[in-house]
Amino acid sequence: MSNYQFTKPAGPFRLSELAKISGATLYEGKGETFTVSGLAKLSEATSNDLVMLHQKKYVKELKNTAARSCIIGPDYVKFAPDSMYLLVHPNPYKAFALIAQAFYPSEKSSSFIAPSAKIESTALIGSDCSIAHGAYVGNHARIGKRCKIGVNTYIGDGVTIGDNCIIEDNVSIRHAVIGSNVVVYPGARIGQDGFGFASDAEGHYKIPHAGGVIIGNDVEIGANTCIDRGSLGNTVIEDWCRLDNLVQIGHNVKIGKGSIIVAQVGIAGSTELGEHVTLAGQVGVIGHLKIGKGATVLTCSKVLRNVQPGDRVIGYPAISISDWQKQIRFLKTAIKSKNPLKS
């Protein structure tokens, strides 16, 4: 059962309501009026919790769970107990996400400005905004409607933030234009100087960064992620992108719509990602490369050359998965042979 110490769920909901919310189908029409009070893991659920099965390795837990209702894919219906009510969806994880949003809706912003917040006289603040203690909003900054600005957050001069944004605690934003429905988690740094120097035998000469950061709509920026501003042009994060915690985005990087950047990724300056690119955890990308639309770079890989649209690459240097698998098989064979230096 979920721990409600910090977040209490909405509801309860009837399964018929959850089917409508998620686009799922009630298996054989059973359980329309069954009431669900929360979401839980298979191993921790009570009878009134809703669980999910989206991987075969959890089938045993499904058979032993106390839950009486489950979000499930069509291929796994045969594994469910006969007495269980099933919400069937071709993408159970998506259905779970939509249902979870119903149980845990985003907090509505209330109109409140803390006495210790500092808002410059030329800043424009939209209606129904919440600005917490110690926050600062600079000259000519613009914040849209229904935004939440967290404790000790810094919004620099001229920054623009759209409607319905959540900027959490201890964030700093400079030289940036941010769209609507954006979430920035605690400790993120947006729009600071990029890492650019001209070097010779006498030292390193700082290159001023006169550009900015452009962030689209419906973007999430993880905790302690850093996005450097451009040197002359802008660093751009397009709509629907998701950046995990501890990500480093260098100056003038462009990240295409719907891309996913997982924790501890580093992208060096002026690299461009197409739409719907995925960079898995701890991927490193050198500067001035292009990663094509729909490409995937697997965990811990290091990208040293362009990646074509739709390619899936892995390794150091990153190569196609098929080539990487061939290399691994060859190495295993060579290690087992009496003379590993001979092919």
From Swiss-Prot:
Keywords: Acyltransferase, Lipid A biosynthesis, Lipid biosynthesis, Lipid metabolism, Repeat, Transferase. Transmembrane segments: none annotated. The active site is at 251 (proton acceptor). CDD domains: LbH_LpxD. GO terms for molecular function: N-acyltransferase activity. It catalyses: a UDP-3-O-[(3R)-3-hydroxyacyl]-alpha-D-glucosamine + a (3R)-hydroxyacyl-[ACP] = a UDP-2-N,3-O-bis[(3R)-3-hydroxyacyl]-alpha-D-glucosamine + holo-[ACP] + H(+). Its EC number is 2.3.1.191. It is an enzyme of class 2 (transferase). GO terms for biological process: lipid A biosynthetic process. Pfam families: Hexapep, LpxD. Belongs to the transferase hexapeptide repeat family. LpxD subfamily. This is UDP-3-O-acylglucosamine N-acyltransferase 2. It comes from Legionella pneumophila (strain Paris).
